């Protein structure tokens, strides 16, 4: 028989830098999960990413206090800010542009995010990422909408 799911917890954690401090400790502690075990497993699983990269993680807690977790790819906004070399998006994206990326960078980000998106079409994924870039005030050189 399958284990009974008690809770599903969604967190955004820095790769290789998870610690028992908030938000991890309180979120897992209230469900009786071994926090240090999660921290060790998450930090080991996030070795492929640059330290500090923000990763969404979905933790499923079972009745016997065991857990499983799924790491997703970094958010599109994080990847766009990194590619454009900006600290944050524009407060007025229609008038104030904060950075530029190339179509090649757009394609790389779309390919990276494909497994988390609900499309298998690269062009559709690129349009989705381009929409996020537009709402952040990041221009895409050579992109025709």
From Swiss-Prot:
Q: Which PROSITE patterns does UniProt cross-reference here? A: RIBOSOMAL_L11
Q: Answer yes or no on keyword Ribonucleoprotein.
A: yes
| Maturation and modification | One or more lysine residues are methylated.
Q: Where are the transmembrane segments?
A: none
Role? Forms part of the ribosomal stalk which helps the ribosome interact with GTP-bound translation factors.
Describe the family membership recorded for this protein in Swiss-Prot or TrEMBL. Belongs to the universal ribosomal protein uL11 family.
This protein is called: Large ribosomal subunit protein uL11
Taxonomic lineage of the native organism: Bacteria, Pseudomonadati, Aquificota, Aquificia, Aquificales
